[in-house]
């Protein structure tokens, strides 16, 4: 057969660091190995011996090329052109890491008599039969159709052995008797690799490590550097374990090839780098320890993460602006979330159609946190509930609510949201979640055009069940009479409904309670305080006294529709939505006997509202009563209400 044209001295030139060369080489050996970390198998990678017909060396395929090997597109004898590769240095050894290639010939007989080139770049002397010595690496190269002869080994000795870096087991292949075989040889002591450009010895490299793509990082590298933009920066987290107290933070990096990786710093390194790292800026990061990514906390598409060490460097690139993207998304249409696994981490984008008020939730550990829900829809014909927790509620949540209330329905991109399958599918924020309002992306522009040109009125089906306070996507409309007739609130869990009704009466004698003003972290205590004999206010929860207290709504009013009347209780947020002022302001008007106090109440009477109610049976002494609590109050919008009624008529007509 005709011999394929391999690049002369291609292996030696590649090992010398000439990554501009795109050598044509042959794969003379290929095998898969399992990459393990933290006791967990991380996946299969492929190692090879590549040859230029004269010399050969070990090579490692990047993870993205594994499918080529598994499918058989790459095999022993394949001739390939390396279009992108880097050289990893592990001590004196060098390994070719292949990032991208083109298969020129899928299968071919082994060309020439390739001789193993030491991983330092120095050729190994002519092979002779020797025993393995002190576990040193052995190189065995299969010869092609050659007229050279060698002594046939005994049956007890494998004809081909290779112990490539990072694997302690040998791989043996016995060729037929007709194929000449080189026997294992002992690698000689290290000699400086020849310089193929200037024909002089290579001096010890003290220059900064060469920048490589994030996708090329692996634990077998010695010196490396990556150039990437910070896309996210976590808060400082403090912990306590058997070794004592500590602190940690992490940040995410994105490079120009789209590779992502997380970087983590502990204790003294946190003090060193926390103020240095800023979201949106580009840095060169070098000399860290690669460890298996903790997938319970790390959502990035990378099997490794970087742990910075004392010798690590993080250097700002102030002039870098456009070559590296500011963010990378992998958006999933909302209809695909229906099939996503519980706790999956994913990116979504949609138009915000509703935002509910912020509520306070008490966690199992007794700590309080903020919760806010909103509704997103996209062109897939589905909508989903997104739950914001903690600081997201008052930061992005307040901004989004203000926009929706002004009739502006923004596009929202959610990066690293967590899927929940509790009562349908929903997406919630976690500590590493990022929210982007009206991002400058093709997907966002496409959604905006769709929504403005008719998508606003397009019917959608929610993939989230309507059990959340204030949820409007699957709005459960009830009349006042149905609350009693259907036994709402009598079960183990509350019922959440929407009632269109008129406010007909206020109890204005007591419309507030005195609340604790103490701030616990970034949240107010809000527990009831009592006035002591010295005139101060005492909080039993905080065990403190205060000169002043806060006033929060505990508003009771009566509503009526065509079917009957009911009493409703509104706390701070809903009360403020109804009356248009805070409880502190309203109490001040009452104390001054200001006529505006009565006007505030009167202005709300005999007005029609949409009230989103939590209906739940509660105990009052020996008596059990159903309590209706307003979680959101809004005036009836004629346009929106007309659309709701038309949709209701349309659905009723379809059933008949």
Swiss-Prot record:
It comes from the Eukaryota. One of its GO terms (biological process) is nucleotide-excision repair. One of its GO terms (cellular component) is DNA replication factor A complex. InterPro entries: Euk_RPA1_DBD_C (IPR047192), NA-bd_OB-fold (IPR012340), NA-bd_OB_tRNA (IPR004365), Rep_factor-A_C (IPR013955), Rep_factor-A_N (IPR007199), REPA_OB_2 (IPR031657), Rfa1 (IPR004591). Residues 225-307 bind DNA. Expressed in root tips, roots, shoot apical meristem (SAM), young leaves, flag leaves and ears, and at lower levels in mature leaves. The keyword DNA repair applies. It is found in: Nucleus. Its main location: nucleus. Keywords: DNA damage, DNA recombination, DNA repair, DNA replication, DNA-binding, Metal-binding, Nucleus, Zinc, Zinc-finger. Induction: Repressed by sucrose starvation. Disruption phenotype: Normal phenotype during vegetative growth, but sterility at the reproductive stage. No formation of embryo sac in female meiocytes and abnormal chromosomal fragmentation after anaphase I in male meiocytes. GO terms for molecular function: damaged DNA binding; single-stranded telomeric DNA binding; zinc ion binding. A zinc finger (C4-type) spans 516-542. Component of the replication protein A complex (RPA) required for DNA recombination, repair and replication. The activity of RPA is mediated by single-stranded DNA binding and protein interactions. Plays an essential role in meiotic and somatic DNA repair, but is dispensable for DNA replication and homologous recombination. Is essential for normal progression through meiosis in pollen mother cells. Is involved in repair of double-strand DNA breaks (DSBs) induced by genotoxic stresses. Heterotrimer of RPA1, RPA2 and RPA3 (canonical replication protein A complex). Interacts with RPA2B. Belongs to the replication factor A protein 1 family. This is Replication protein A 70 kDa DNA-binding subunit A. It comes from Oryza sativa subsp. japonica.
